[in-house]
Amino acid sequence: LYDLFREAWSELRREEYPDLFETVDEERAWGVESLELLANYFSVEDPRSFEPLDRELDMLEDLDGITIRGILDRMEEIDGRLVITDYKSGKAPPERYALPAFFALKIYALLIRRRTGRTPDAIRLIYLNGPTVYSIEVNDRQLDAMDRQLRALWSAIERALEREEFPPRPGRLCDWCSFQELCPAFGGENTPVPRAPASAAAS
């Protein structure tokens, strides 16, 4: 398995990512971490034991004027139940805080329902850094609520664009943000970007 990984990475590096790492040590550290994640995945399941309906499914759907696109990692049927799965390379949140992590998967479930007419029965997150697996049931009522939430979010984005109002929302993730010097929450000044002419925007 490790030999297959090294062979695949050598080919990708040569053809698509020749300048990804500045030093050999950086590449080696990344390789070691990647091999650990790969081993963790095989401790969760054996991919030879099932045949997914789809992998890396390109989801592009128009929800009555709201265009949504994403890549669904995996969809399969298990004992007559439709399950969609997303892989995460990071660490899993504590279980009591895990529900918000299903936000994107609920959107995928909504798109699958719209595309196929079938409601997924469950959505699953596999955190490879652990590993940890979280799974929850879904139904039409939940997906209807997600549809309303998406439309409300889209309306809020449109209002913010019209008013050019983007208030900061400080939180723990700010520690990793590269734009603190531009953020009012950290004493920065966010200079408005000139809008493109209507003709340019339309093209």
Show the residue positions of the predicted features.
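Metal-dependent nuclease catalytic regions and adjoining charged, substrate-binding loops involved
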Residues: 111-203
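Short amphipathic alpha-helical segments and their helix-coil junctions
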Residues: 16-17, 84, 90, 153-161
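Generic alpha-helical structural signal
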Residues: 32-35, 39, 106, 144-155
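A non-catalytic, helix-rich entry segment at domain boundaries
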Residues: 1-55
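Non-catalytic, well-ordered alpha-helical scaffold segments
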Residues: 32-35, 102-106, 171-175, 180
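Conserved helix-loop functional segments at active or binding sites
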Residues: 43-44, 87, 114, 163
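Short, mixed-charge aromatic SLiMs
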Residues: 1-16, 61-62, 130-136, 201-203
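Mg2+/Mn2+-dependent nuclease catalytic core
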Residues: 57-150
